[in-house]
Regions:
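N-terminal, positively charged, Ser/Thr/Ala/Gly-biased leader segments
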Residues: 1-5, 18-26, 60
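Extended hydrophobic secondary-structure segments that form protein cores and membrane-embedded regions
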Residues: 4-5, 68-74, 129-136, 260-261
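N-terminal nucleotide-binding beta1-loop-alpha1 segment
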Residues: 1-16, 67-83
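Flexible loop/turn segments at secondary-structure boundaries
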Residues: 10-14, 77-81, 138-141, 162-164, ...
Length: 474
């Protein structure tokens, strides 16, 4: 079964090498640089790119009907999970579950996601050739899958409380016909859901959609405007046209048949933010508390603490909560508190104070360079630098600059924090340590300031995602 992945640009060229993936089974591409296609337009782009690559002489609809396939959208901007933006969230390493057998130390989000999607497609009727899912979630089915009906669109959902559903898409069905979609809503209020519950049932959309060839062709058709592939969202645009009483009228799309299925024993874990990286991993680890089933005998100082492929000389204690250390060296001279993610740090002898809520990331650059890339646990990498509400490391960018004796104007591309040329490329681990100290906890450190001002800073969050070689990160 072919897998089609939409990935960050830097990951496309080396994905097959890194994952040891068969090129005949896995197809990878990225959205055109600078374009915003949305999940619908991105689906059209991914499918058409694959068709052109593997069957250039075939008609698109003919190619669609030849085999089943799984599409994973994993090329998002990762503004809220900066630590894994350069490498792609879908390859985020996930700790072995303490209660599970047969897992791999090298497992990642992709390897955990895929078995359920393959199981669904194997069970799906022959008319459903395409499954579309998101790359930043881990979804489990604790019970056997039910029969999948023959419809143009089949969507899976979860029974959830209205307070959780209000942040997601929602499938609304009549209590008389719970397996048929009445209409879809996007982020409805708790009050709206409360009124609907008198006559309707609702399931939270978990992003697993199966489409017939007819539905795919119409989705692709709607993704084009004036002959050009444009922004089209599969959920807020395409989804709202579906159901018995759709919220958006469209003569062709309104005629698509739709079935809604609750995922049996379903569990949904989102890995979209730094906080969710830890909270979702903790939730999965805590699925089993029966000590007879838990194979890991070592007790961590704090349950929300995850260390993988790392050498840690610093003594972690129960005071260190929401800690994630991966592929890094943390020496005895470090001081860590809580809400900290540490990734990619090379061997060092630094004395580094890491404030609560500050994360440390190092990205290799070129053959021997290092990019110092600290950020805040809750940073969203969004907004113009001059705006008071644009935060970096838990404070406004203006405040961060002021305490370090620099001006916001010194940072190029200040129209958006994601594009800002903020991160210095250092030539040695020693330079890296000094500039990191200045950027996170020692604003008066003149040596760090001089390195930051001297070093090449044409490196932004966007630049790293688009150009850094992923091979160096594994």
């Amino acid at each position: 079964m072919k897998k089609l992945l939409s990935l960050p640009p830097n990951l496309v060229e080396c994905f097959h090498d890194i994952e040891k993936a068969d090129q005949t089974e896995w197809f990878c591409t990225s959205d055109p640089i600078g374009s915003k296609l949305g999940s619908g337009g991105g689906t059209a782009w991914l499918l058409e790119a694959c068709c052109q690559k593997v069957a250039p002489d075939s008609d698109f609809l003919t190619w669609l009907g030849k085999e089943k396939r799984i599409l994973l959208h994993a090329g998002g901007q990762s503004r809220r999970l900066p630590g894994y933006a350069p490498s792609g969230k879908i390859l985020t390493p996930i700790p072995v579950f303490r209660w599970a057998r047969g897992q791999r130390l090298s497992q990642n989000l992709l390897s955990l996601q895929l078995p359920l999607y393959e199981q669904i497609m194997e069970k799906a009727p022959s008319s459903l050739h395409t499954l579309i899912a998101s790359g930043d979630v881990y979804i489990r089915a604790g019970q056997p899958l039910q029969t999948i009906p023959d419809a143009d669109v089949v969507c899976y959902g979860l029974w959830v409380d209205p307070n959780l559903a209000k942040n997601h898409g929602v499938f609304v069905s009549s209590r008389a016909t719970p397996d048929k979609l009445d209409f879809m809503l996007q982020k409805p209020s708790v009050e709206e859901l409360g009124k609907l519950m008198q006559t309707h049932l609702f399931l939270m959309d978990i992003g697993i959609w199966l489409l017939s060839d007819r539905a795919v062709s119409l989705l692709v058709k709607r993704s084009y405007k004036e002959g050009k592939l444009s922004y089209y969202d599969m959920y807020s645009d395409f989804g709202l046209t579906l159901g018995e009483h759709p919220r958006t009228m469209d003569d062709e799309l309104n005629k698509l048949s739709v079935a809604i299925l609750p995922l049996p024993g379903g569990e949904f874990y989102h890995y979209g933010t730094s906080r969710e990286l830890i909270s979702s991993t903790l939730a999965v680890q805590n699925l089993v508390n029966d000590q007879r089933e838990i194979m890991h005998k070592k007790v961590k100082p704090h349950p929300a603490m995850f260390v993988q492929n790392a050498e840690v000389g610093y003594q972690l204690t129960s005071q260190n909560s929401e800690i994630w250390i991966e592929n890094s060296y943390v020496g005895a001279g470090w001081n860590i508190h809580h809400q900290t993610i540490i990734t990619g740090v090379p061997a060092n002898n630094w004395n580094l104070e890491v404030p609560s809520g500050v994360c440390i990331d190092v990205v290799p650059f070129g053959e021997s360079g290092y990019v110092a890339r600290p950020y805040g646990f809750n940073d969203t990498f969004k907004g113009a630098l001059a705006k008071e509400e644009t935060y970096y490391q838990g404070m406004s960018v203006g405040e961060w600059c002021a305490v370090r004796g620099i001006s916001v104007e010194e940072i190029e591309n200040g129209h958006d924090l994601q594009a800002a040329r903020l991160f210095p490329v250092c030539s040695s681990v020693e330079e890296l340590g000094a500039v990191m100290r200045w950027m996170v906890s020692e604003p008066a450190l003149q040596q760090g300031k001089e390195i930051w001002q001297r070093c090449r800073k044409s490196v932004s969050y966007t630049h790293l995602r688009a150009h850094e070689t992923r091979r160096h990160l594994v």
